[in-house]
């Protein structure tokens, strides 16, 4: 008899719970895809896919609210129809009648924890893959709508175009602007450009091959015209580079190896490249200051470059050579007494040379870019001469490899340590100091976010039980009122818990505060809700 009664109550709960879940999910799912539609310009075909992928995020909030509504409504009706009084008169205790509601609350709490820690991040990654697969359409659609597009995630490159043709992947009347630190680094204008995407696991690489181009740089850069020019940029993550979209095992991996989190890995590689540049600049400065032999040598597989310069100054991942610059490019065999000199260049009064890292930051090559130089053999003036594929000197590589593990991964902690920075005799440049400080902040923030995210998911999942049980109790207490009055009253303690979670999470993630206070606030909200539920049921069971 008791099992039949409980099954009846549970069935009544499901009759309200399931339609409520479906209705709320449909409404909130439509709201959840508005941002991707507005920001990324996804097409109609992808809208249904995104609704499916964002479903676990929606269910995380819908399931507790639907169970709260069902519990307050069903038990309020049972109490209003005196069915609970009939059960008591038959010797069935209130605790026995409440068991179906408790079972639903526990099921919802377990589902919420599984959704938050495991399922929701997987579906967000699927949504990310879906958006990446449609990256070309997103770019062209945004250019057609605005008519410009900022390449995510940092908006470093802005692409403007008068006309976009997605059928043959071309843009007409193109302007590509590179912005760094709120400063325009360069502007490239082109008659037309072809856009291609090279997909990878972490990001898509966008290659823009421009035709009839003019490049305008900052004050210290040379302006020039080129028939063809290729620009490669990163089309980064749209959704997943956020701790709140990580699974529990991913967060644990990030905590043990910080380079598993792409924003940290990317910034650490930039800092590593800047550190390598400054080490190279230090080595060049020491060599060209040597009065006995002031020639600096760089090698590649097939050639060798020797150069002298008046001075070498370090910049943002580049070294600027100035003064009287003389560059000799020769076959590698020439250094052994065979072969021949390929070219000897000497800069004019307005000339200069740049030496910068190219390719993979962890295993880079060097490129020398020489401006306004005259060929000694012929007297011809070269406005620009580029030598690529030079190898980082062994003196520099010996030090930089100490920052890598045997697998080639960066040791971030060593990179940002003050002790290792003493290798640079003149200290770190403002660029390297800024990168290190930024890296320290993002590491601290990431670790704080991981801690706050884990605790917030736990508190909200466990709190679902107390939240739903309070709704059931208030439904019984307010049996003489409106059917929705109990639901409205039970939303108040639920709102208190949510406010405590959001406030605690914000405090825990704030680097200027003690994050333990935010964690305590979250669990204090759960303790308040649990004590309130215990007090209400103590009163109900007593009478």
Each language-model region and where it sits:
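Transmembrane alpha-helices
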Residues: 1-188, 194-347, 354-369, 374-543
């Amino acid at each position: 008899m008791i099992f039949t009664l409980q099954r009846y109550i549970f069935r009544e709960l499901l009759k309200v719970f399931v339609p409520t879940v479906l209705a709320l999910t449909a409404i909130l799912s439509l709201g959840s895809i508005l941002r991707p539609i507005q920001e990324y310009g996804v097409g109609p075909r992808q809208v249904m896919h995104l609704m499916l992928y964002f479903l676990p995020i929606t269910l995380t909030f819908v399931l507790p609210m639907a169970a709260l509504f069902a519990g307050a409504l069903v038990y309020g009706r049972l109490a209003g129809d005196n069915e609970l009084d009939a059960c008591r008169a038959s010797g069935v205790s209130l605790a026995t009648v409440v068991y179906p509601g408790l079972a639903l609350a526990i099921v919802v709490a377990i589902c919420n924890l599984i959704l938050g820690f495991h399922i929701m991040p997987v579906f967000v990654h699927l949504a990310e893959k879906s958006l990446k697969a449609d990256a070309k359409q997103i770019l062209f659609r945004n250019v057609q709508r605005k008519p410009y597009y900022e390449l995510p995630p940092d908006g470093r490159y802005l692409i403007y175009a008068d006309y976009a043709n997605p059928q043959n992947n071309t843009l007409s009347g193109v302007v590509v602007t590179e912005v760094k630190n709120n400063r325009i680094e360069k502007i490239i204008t082109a008659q037309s450009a072809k856009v291609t995407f090279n997909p990878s696991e972490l990001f898509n690489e966008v290659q823009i091959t421009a035709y009839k181009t003019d490049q305008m740089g900052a004050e210290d850069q040379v302006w020039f015209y080129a028939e063809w020019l290729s620009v490669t940029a990163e089309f980064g993550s749209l959704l997943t580079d956020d701790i709140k979209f990580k699974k529990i095992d991913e967060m644990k991996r990030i905590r043990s190896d910080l380079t598993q989190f792409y924003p940290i890995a990317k910034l650490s590689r930039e800092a590593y490249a800047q550190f390598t540049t400054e080490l190279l600049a230090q080595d060049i400065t020491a060599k060209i200051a040597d009065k006995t032999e002031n020639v600096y040598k760089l090698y590649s597989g097939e050639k060798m470059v020797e150069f002298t310069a008046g001075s070498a100054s370090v910049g943002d991942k580049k070294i600027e050579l100035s003064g009287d610059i003389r560059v000799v490019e020769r076959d590698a065999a020439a250094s052994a007494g065979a072969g021949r000199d390929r070219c000897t260049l000497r800069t004019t009064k307005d000339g200069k040379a740049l030496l910068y890292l190219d390719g993979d930051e962890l295993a880079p090559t060097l490129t020398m870019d020489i401006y306004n130089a005259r060929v000694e053999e012929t007297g011809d003036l070269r406005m620009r001469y580029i030598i690529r594929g030079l190898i980082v000197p062994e003196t520099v590589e010996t030090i930089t490899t100490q920052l890598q593990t045997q697998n080639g991964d960066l040791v971030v902690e060593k990179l940002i340590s003050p002790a290792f920075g003493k290798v640079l005799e003149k200290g770190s440049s403002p660029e390297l100091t800024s990168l290190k400080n930024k890296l320290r902040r993002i590491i601290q923030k990431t670790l704080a976010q991981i801690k706050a995210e884990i605790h917030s998911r736990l508190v909200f999942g466990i709190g679902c039980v107390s939240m739903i049980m309070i709704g059931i109790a208030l439904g019984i207490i307010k049996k003489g009122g409106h059917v929705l009055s109990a639901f409205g009253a039970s939303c108040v303690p639920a709102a208190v818990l949510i406010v405590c979670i959001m406030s605690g999470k914000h405090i825990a993630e704030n680097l200027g505060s003690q994050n333990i206070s935010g964690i305590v606030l979250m669990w204090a909200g759960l303790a308040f809700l649990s004590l309130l539920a215990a007090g209400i049921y103590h009163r109900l069971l007593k009478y």
